[in-house]
Amino acid sequence: MTDIRITEVPREAGFGDYFALLKPRVMSLVVFTALVGLLVAPATVHPMIALTGILFIALGAGASGALNMWWDADIDRVMKRTRNRPVPAGVVQPGEALGLGLALSGIAVVMLGLATNLFAAGLLAFTIFFYAVVYSMWLKRTTPQNIVIGGAAGAFPPMIGWAVATGGVSLESLFMFALIFMWTPPHFWSLALFMKTDYSDAGVPMLTVTHGRRVTRGHVLAYALLLAPLAVAGAFTGIGGPLYLVVALALNGWLLRGAVRIWRRDEAEAEADRYRTEKGFFRFSLYYLFLHFGAILAEAALKPYGLGGW
């Protein structure tokens, strides 16, 4: 009797697969925060310049995603959450992801510099380098503080948007950077609480893997305690106002409540309800950031009518 083995042949890559390399979900957050940074800056920007600037910031974010998928293909193949990405699934070859990432990086940086200013282009270039090299190639696989330090990569977009409009930085753009930077650890650690097995199987030293869930819960609370007053203080900057203050107080009250609940939970309780509280906190943290930046944008939109700001 002859054994017949059927080998599944990877399908041919389509446009959607190459687009997925750019991490469109992450790109949407980058575009939104960069757009807010650009629109609330105290400078008048021609609509075409603004549109072009956001386009190339988005392209730079996508380039970072493609480079990350190229480098992380080995661990993405192990993790349930990422194994169906184009490279680990065998649909897109690693070299294609690398080539696309490098090409888009060059186009994004050069064109942003030509369309806006060199400072914004330099900041975009540094952001791509920080995410692709400092975070992906170094921090992610070597330290449980990977997302703490690496979180800077995701915090730069509003600064880049601000730089497109003004050609520099300010207290307000630094505040937006700090808001995302301090939000990143509790956001990803809440994910790691219910995805610990994925990270341990892939050999990624997330805090849950190196120090356990109990310590991670304490860190979520600690960062929430640092994030909340920072977020509320933004109401008293040049981009804040009463509307932002109300939104920030409500969101950060909910943030602290959720962080305390996570800190108090024991593993038996969490396993019994399949980490429902942790999953809820993770979902809330996504709305948390969008709503803060939405409130900042609303304050700027109301100012011409004498309603925004103090």
From Swiss-Prot:
Please give the superkingdom of this protein's source. Bacteria
User: Can you quote a single GO CC term?
Assistant: plasma membrane
Which membrane topology describes this protein?
Multi-pass membrane protein
Span-the-membrane segments of this chain are: 26-46, 47-67, 95-115, 118-138, 147-167, 174-194, 220-240, 243-263, 281-301
Q: Give the reaction(s) catalysed.
A: heme b + (2E,6E)-farnesyl diphosphate + H2O = Fe(II)-heme o + diphosphate
Its annotated pathway? Porphyrin-containing compound metabolism; heme O biosynthesis; heme O from protoheme: step 1/1
GO biological process assignments: heme O biosynthetic process
List the molecular function annotations (GO) for this entry: protoheme IX farnesyltransferase activity
Q: Which UniProt keywords apply?
A: Cell inner membrane, Cell membrane, Heme biosynthesis, Membrane, Transferase, Transmembrane, Transmembrane helix
EC numbers on record: 2.5.1.141
Q: What else is known?
A: Carbon 2 of the heme B porphyrin ring is defined according to the Fischer nomenclature.
Q: What does this protein do?
A: Converts heme B (protoheme IX) to heme O by substitution of the vinyl group on carbon 2 of heme B porphyrin ring with a hydroxyethyl farnesyl side group.
* Subunit description: Interacts with CtaA.
HAMAP family under this entry? CyoE_CtaB
Q: What is this protein called?
A: Protoheme IX farnesyltransferase
Q: Which gene encodes it?
A: ctaB
